[in-house]
Amino acid sequence: METLTAISRWLAKQHVVTWCVQHEGELWCANAFYLFDAQKVAFYVLTEEKTRHAQMSGPRAPVAGTVNGQPKTVARIRGIQFKGEIRKLEGEESDAARQAYLRRFPVARMLPAPVWEIRLDEIKFTDNTLGFGKKMHWLRSPIRSL
């Protein structure tokens, strides 16, 4: 099975992402329900602009984070570590992402928070169900200029 396909299938079954931002030497992490877009390899989250992590992110910022399950045994551990970039969406891009997010989490209709995209540029997927310490890696291909 292709690495990104395996990662995408697993992420589709999860729902909480943790991401961390850094600003002027200070670190802060946040958790949120996410919608994963396998085509763009990105999470969509809702978070208020007044939160500490949004203030530290500004309109866009580098991020690192994790998604993991809560297995009761080491043999069932699965999860990702990632790095990428978070940015606040605007206009039609925001509207489209919000509609997709609301299909997955209808209760979020009550939350007027902006939509943010976390674009994943590097992923390490640990899957102990395939053997202890089994790791898969994915890197976004650089865009070549003409």
UniProtKB/Swiss-Prot annotation:
Annotated signal sequence range: none
Gene3D superfamilies assigned to the protein according to its UniProt record, in alphabetical order: Electron Transport, Fmn-binding Protein, Chain A
Classification via NCBIfam families: PRK03467.1
InterPro entries: Split_barrel_FMN-bd (IPR012349), UPF0306 (IPR011194)
Coiled-coil boundaries: none
Homology family: Belongs to the UPF0306 family.
Record-given protein name: UPF0306 protein CKO_04548
